[in-house]
Structure formats: structure tokens, C-alpha cells
Amino acid sequence: MNLKQMLVMSAMTAATLAQPVDAQNAPFIGRQRADQVAQTVKNGRLTPEALWGMGRIGGFALNQQGNMGVYSVTYYSIKQNKSHSVLYSYDMNTQESKCLTTSTKSEGGGVFIKGGSKIAFLSSESGSSQVWEMNPDGTERRQLSHEPDDVLEFLFSPDEAQVILIKEVESTTSIQKNDEDLPQATGIVCNDLMYKHWDQYVRAIPHPFVAAFDGNKISGTFDILKDEPYECPMLPFGGVEQLAWSPDGRQVAYTCRKKTGRDYAISTDSDIYLYDIQSGQTRNLCKPADYKEPEKNATVSLAQQSVNQQEGDCTVGYDQNPQFSPNGRYIAWTSMARDGYESARTRLCVLNLKTGSKTYVTESFESGVNEFCWTPDSKGFYFTGVWHGRTHVYTTNLKGEVNQLTRGDYDYSLLQALPFGRGVLVKRHSMSAADEVFTLVPEGKGLRIRQLTEENKAFYDQITMGEVKERWVKTSDGKDMLCWVIYPPHFDAKKKYPALLFCEGGPQSPVSQFWSYRWNFQVMAANDYIIIAPNRRGLPGFGMEWLEEISGDYSGQCMQDYLSAIDDLCREPYVDKDHLGAVGASFGGYSVYWLAGNHDKRFKAFIAHDGIYNTQQQYVETEELWFPNWDMGSAPWEKAANEQMQKAFATSPHLYVDRWDTPILCIHGQRDFRIEYTQAESAFTAARMRGLDAQLLLFPDENHWVLKPQNGILWQRTFFRWLDKWLKK
């Protein structure tokens, strides 16, 4: 469980306190029985209620022998409007799992310690989140840490004599403290940028603390970033994967962007630092000791400044997620070459700790590295990457010889290498099934795939999923574009079905074989819609030229790609071309707002979730300013900056409102600081002022996503009521 998941879990727990449910007497939220599943499935089809009833598998860790695992699953109660994370053990020999959690308090982050005789985990059973231990059968639970504040995550050293605890510390770099004699004042005085991030006002940031562990208790905690105003792990999504112990336990490698305020807001330049436990000295592994930060123009895109290019061994983009080789000779991490560009190709960098030489071992791979882990012999890696709408597992050695390990219409994510060089532990999902845990074991030229968990079997046994097909579409400029088409269950080609164009967000996130608990294609298909999901310009997995063509051209070829996709689908006799809808979130919401004024009457309904309506407004409202700086070309007041900037703001969706002629539903979370909810309010107001049928759905307590069960159900019901009203009449 990473920091993001822990924060979400804490938020859900806090939200529960406001509910009229006695936490002490609340029912245990866990895996649903087959009869409970039957109450949420409708005519053998997936429903929003069934979707929220499914278990969501988190981390899975093996013991050193590889014969026992521990993993977490999060369940949701619509009635109680909260989640509950529980731990399971898994016997690799008998293939049996056992629930270890007996409390209504959430537990997670399970790992084996003491040679596999104990499981360490996080629990809030004592009133705050602390590190506990228990036997592999769940007995003899005992609290190990007694910190005065919450432990968000932990990481034991290889010899287990020390442990890293992730805890929050006060931050006053952007928000100053209010006067002490005004304890009930709610005003927020901000002195610099990054006063808000994702969905929080930044009054606290995570820091890594190192503590001693004598086998009985965790004590002697000290902050390795003491008096430094920087976050580690990096907000908003970084977790303990951004830190690593050296095999001898003498050093800690950590990820950090040592910037604050405006400097932080315009830069993606994070580095890998090596902290020596004994001396307390820190060394930057990404830059030379005499490196001086170049001066940057904050209102001009870094793409136009010399600071954004890697020079020699000095890296200036995202460097994160360090891992030492098992033999201690190397350290590896993921690295981007350009500052201010969060979608640059992620390469796997390997540093020889003795010679200081760096090697990029995935240069021959045409896409970016998502996750990686060392092989036990320290001679290579497993890693995942997106290619042609699928996320697969690959291998590479230290020479950079890359080979694809997995095939099929799936998305994989790595968990850990199996001990003794036997393969790798992964999670796998598709557009038709949620995450389950598998082992991959190479055998000669083949691969043995073994499924370990069947968390949601009771659902799949009662649900018929729609067929998912790959479809290649010719774009308006003559390129070939991969689209996924999802058909309703029991599809009949002799009938006509309304169709939806799905507009992906990001704007550089892949339309791979993803499974979503909100934007779920199978729920849409279960409502008798055909969905086409294009891998339009700007998405990874089709080479860097395809990926980067969207930067500075939001309203250009990528929009034509959308229209090419829906026009191609409409050639099929079973598609009702008079009843088409376009839906999307984030950049997908931008796409919907833009298409609303440029669709030539193709669509009969639009839905935009957390979308950008006004690009000029977005530039000064969002918090991570490197993003609009790069993609829009510069600040809107830099009149003569460049053609890219002028086009980005001159083609903003709000400038086409005079052409809007179609009903539109605008959805937004009011805790969304990435794209402010005022964008949806503005779009809704414009639509109603023009006399269009429109609806506005606001969530005062949600961010860029919808995380609470009852809000999620309301989202789905509103979504389909709107589509059905306009596309099924």
C-alpha cells in the first residue's frame, strides 16, 4: 500500500466519522458471498452496485522462501459509505488464502519479517496508524511502533535492524501559520505557489524517518531530511517505492525534488539522493557536487529554454524509484531527460556504485518504463511498459538487450521477483476483469502463467461481459490508429445500438487494457452501448513522435483522430449513427468541451468530467504549472512567446460556445485542484445561457476522482440517466 492509498484510506476512515453509523458496531466489510453478489447483478450484467461490491487487490508480498504470501484487499460498503482494507495470507503450495483481519479498522502494507515467522503491517487499531506484527495465521498481534503521529508507510532494512517510517511534518513554505490567538480562524494566508496540491492545502508534507528495531519495538526515530522543507516521498502519489535500503543497511536512497514554491511549481526535476546512516552525509546521484541550478523563466515553457536538456550524466527530469541490486554493486532508477515535461520517455538508468558510470538499459525499447525490479542474480531486470494498447512484462540485461515476456490483451503490473530466480510476481487486469495476482515463470522459450488469487470469481460466475475487439482506423492524415471497441453482452449484429466515443485523459495516458471502477467500459456495454476508445495522437505505446504530437496542439490532430474513430465505427450497420455520445474526463473533458463546438452535429449528448473549458483560466488555476507551461507553450500574457502558445489559447473550448447545439452534462469535484470546479460551472452556465439542455453535477468532497461509494453510485446513475435520455429515445 503506497502513500496515496494510505491517504485515501485515512480520508475514507475520516469520512466515516460523519456517517450515522456506530464504528464499533458497524458490520465487518469484506468479501461478498454469491447470494450477496446476486442482489447487485442485473440480468447477468455488470452494474455500478456490483462494481463497487468487488474486492480491489493491493500489494502482495512473499516470504524469503517463496512459499507464503500476504496481500491486501479493499472492500467498499455502499450503505456505510466507506471502505475497509483487510489482509490475507496465501499458501503457495496449497493455493489457499485466509483472511487475517478481524477488526473493523483498516489494515495494509503487509510484509514478512523475522525469517517469515511474522508479518509486519499497518493498523489503526490503537487509535493512530502504527506498525504491528502478527503470526502468519493472524494470531499474536502486537504493536511495534508507538509514534506520536500516524505512520503512513514503512520499509525494513534487509537485516531488519532498522526501519524507515514515513510520517508527516509541518510545512510553512507556502502557507503561513495563523496567529495563535485566533485558533478558530479558517483563513489561509499563502505566500508562494504550491500552497495546494491535488486535493489538499499543503500544511504538511511527508518525510522519511529512520528508527532502530530490536525485534520487540521500534524506537529512536530521526528524520533524514531534518530541517529540510522538501517532501519525500513526492506528493501527491509517491509512496515508499521512492526509497530503498542498501543491502548492507548502511545507506538509504531516496527520491526528492529539492524545490519549494514557484521553483517547485514549474519543474519536474527530481533526483536520487544517497544518505549515509553513520555519517549523516547526503550525495546527489543525478548531478555533480558542483552543480548550480540554472536560472529559469517561470512564464516561458522550459521546452524553449536550454535548462530542459540532459547534459552528460546530469539528469534534469523526473528521476525516481531507486532500487539497489541484490549484490549491492549497482543502483537503478527510472529517469526522464527533460525538465518540465512529465510525459518524456522514462528510461531505466543503472549506476555502477564503484566506477560511477551510468547505463540506460532500455534505450532499444520504443516506449517508457512503468515499473521495474532486479532479478535475484543482479544481472538484469523485469519491467513493464505500454505498447500498442497493452502493458506487458519485459526483461533486459545490463547490456540493454530487451525481450518481451508476456502476450495477450492484458495490462500487467509488477510486484516482486520470485526468490531463487524463478520468475516474477505480477498483477494482471483487462477491460473485462479486475486485478488478480499471477506468477510468471520462464520455461525454455515458453512462459508458465499461474493464477494465484480469484478475488472476484463470485462476480464473474454471474456476469456476462461484452466482447472487446481491436480495431485499426485510418486517420485523416493517413496514419493507422488502434482503437478498442467494446460490445454489449449478447451482441446482435442485426440490431442497432447507440454508441459512445470515449475521450482519454492525461493527455498522455494510454488507452490500454485498463479496468476502471468509474470509467468502466463493461458497465457502459451492459447498458447496451457500443464504445469506441481510440489511442489518438498523444498516447504512449506507438513511438515518441505519436506521443509528442499533442503537446501544444490540443485542438489539432488528436481531435481529428477522435472524429475519424467515430466516423469509422458508424460505417457498421449495427451502429445507430443518429444516437451518438461523447464522454471523457480531464483532458477527455477538454475534448468533450471542444467537440461540443466542432462536431458538425455528429453527437446527440456530451458528458465532461473534470474537464478544461477555458485554457487561459486553467493556466493560472492549476497547481503543477510545468504542465500548462509545456503543453500550452508559455503563459497567456507572453504575447510574442511563440506560435504554439498563441494557438493553444486561441482554440480554447470556451471560444466555440457560440456553436454549441447539443445537450451536455458537466461533472466536477470541488476538491479538484488539478482542474478547478469553476471550469464545469462556467461550461454549465454558458450552455444554459444559450438555452441548451444541460446538467451540472458537483461533488463538494471529491477531487479529480470520485472515491466515495455513494458518490460513485450517484455518478454512474447520473451518467446513464443523461445518456439514456438523449440516446435511447
Regions found by a protein language model. Give the residues of each.
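Cap/lid segment of the alpha/beta-hydrolase catalytic domain
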Residues: 260, 446, 455-578, 585-586, ...
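Predominantly five- to eight-bladed beta-propeller fold
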Residues: 26-35, 84-85, 168-227, 255-273, ...
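Active-site-proximal cap/loop segments of hydrolase catalytic domains
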Residues: 520, 525, 533-729
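Short glycine/acidic-enriched loop and turn motifs that connect beta-strands
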Residues: 75-79, 125-128, 170-173, 259-262, ...
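Beta-strand-rich domains and repeat architectures in extracellular enzymes and scaffolds
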Residues: 49-85
